[in-house]
């Protein structure tokens, strides 16, 4: 009798596992389908929609590394700033970008920066150099890592992408930079900047 029960259990296990796997796969497919159909979305206050035709009418430029050259691309845009530069950065150790920010401050451009907390201990971070130049620098503290790479220029240009503002990003890594000239998009990024500044930053 015991032998028959063991045989029944042994035969049942594959069936149970197979059924469970089938339910899992079917459920995964169902929820993936829902997400792909955009039935699931963040609240409208947290997500902005821009159609491809809409963006195609904007002035959009891109830069990729390798080869090197995206730092120069960013510096050129910073040199064109007339009124304001708002930056969010995880890594901030590139001398050329730092110099461009300081020069902008010296010619009367409002420069405000939010950096990840790692810059407090990073050996090559330009945090204190920026601070000494009287630039408004804040540390984005919570939650987690402040991994944004964003520059908003004159409230009408947005530079973003994977590119940290470091030498490694320009010389060693495979990175991308995108520049979009659009006032509505810039406003969206600015709102996020001020939100981060108000709730999650330590001011020097």
Curated annotation (Swiss-Prot):
The active site is at 147, 149, 154. It comes from the Bacteria. Gene3D superfamilies: Endonuclease Chain A. The keyword Oxidoreductase does not apply. Its main location: secreted. It is found in: Secreted. It catalyses: a 1,2-diacyl-sn-glycero-3-phosphocholine + H2O = a 1,2-diacyl-sn-glycero-3-phosphate + choline + H(+). It is an enzyme of class 3 (hydrolase). Residues 1-22 form the signal peptide. GO terms for biological process: lipid catabolic process; phosphorus metabolic process. Keywords: Hydrolase, Lipid degradation, Lipid metabolism, Secreted, Signal, Virulence. InterPro entries: PLD-like_dom, PLD_domain, PLipase_D/transphosphatidylase. It holds the Pfam family PLDc_2. Its EC number is 3.1.4.4. Belongs to the phospholipase D family. Homodimer. Could be a virulence factor. This is Phospholipase D.
